[in-house]
Amino acid sequence: MAGHSKWANIQHRKGRQDAKRGKLWTKIIREITVAARAGGADPDSNPRLRMAWDKATDANMPKDNIQRAIQRGAGGADGESYEEVRYEGYGIGGAAVIVDCMTDNRTRTVAEVRHAFAKHGGNLGQEGSVAFMFKHCGQFVFAPGTSEEAVMEAALEAGAEDIATDEEGVIEVVCAPADFTAVRQAFEAAGLKAEVDGVVMKALNETELTGEDAVKMQKLLDVLESLDDVQEVYTNVVFDEAQ
C-alpha cells in the first residue's frame, strides 16, 4: 500500500465531518436523547450518555442544546421514538460497509439505504454479511509527534487492550467499549488529546481503492452519511493519498 497514508485518510474524513457540522449536531442530539431515555439523565452513571455528551462538546455544541436533549429523553416527552437499526452491504470492489441508523420508520430507512447502495455501485447485504470483518471497540488516534511513552502509560493504566504506532508516527489505542470513558479520562488527566476517538466498528483488514473506484466509493459514503436516519457509516476502505 505504497500510496496509503492512515493520517491523510483520518484528516480527510475529519474534514468531511466538520463540513457537515449542522448535520452532525442533529445526529448527536438524537444520540443524547436516546441515551438519556434508555439510561437516565446522569452522565456519570450512564456511559452511553457520557460518550454522547463528550461528542457534543467536541463538536462545540452549546450546553443548553445538550441539556434540552437530555431533558427530552429522560423526561420521556412525547415525540419521535427512535429504534436503532444496523444495515450491512458492499461498496465498490466488494468493500465492506456498515450503516448504523436511528429511525422512527424502519421501512423508510431501509428503502433509502438500499437506494443509496444501488445508485452508487454497491448493494445492500443481509445481516451478518460483513460485520465479522469489523471489531466493536473503543478507538483513539493521536497525531504524529504525540509522545508515545505518555500515551502508552496513560492507556495501559486505564485498561487499554492494544497500542500501535505506524511509520508516520500515528498512534492508535484500542480498548473494550466498556472501558472507553475511563481511557478517555486517563488521557485527559495526562493532558493528551486524541485527534479522533469513539466507540466504533474497526475494520480488521483494510482494502485500498484508487482512481475512479476511490471517487465512486467516496460518493457512496457521502450519500449514506447524508441520509437523515444514518448515525454512523463504517468501511474497511482506505484511499490513496492522491484522492
UniProtKB/Swiss-Prot annotation:
One of its GO terms (molecular function) is DNA binding. It comes from Bordetella parapertussis (strain 12822 / ATCC BAA-587 / NCTC 13253). It is found in: Cytoplasm. Keywords: Cytoplasm, DNA-binding, Transcription, Transcription regulation. GO terms for cellular component: cytosol. Residues 1-21 are annotated as: Disordered. InterPro entries: Integrase-like_N (IPR017856), TACO1_YebC-like_2nd/3rd_dom (IPR048300), TACO1_YebC_N (IPR049083), Transcrip_reg_TACO1-like (IPR002876), Transcrip_reg_TACO1-like_dom3 (IPR026564), YebC-like (IPR029072). Belongs to the TACO1 family. PANTHER family: TRANSCRIPTIONAL REGULATORY PROTEIN YEBC-RELATED, TRANSLATIONAL ACTIVATOR OF CYTOCHROME C OXIDASE 1. Its main location: cytoplasm. GO terms for biological process: regulation of DNA-templated transcription. This is Probable transcriptional regulatory protein BPP2422.
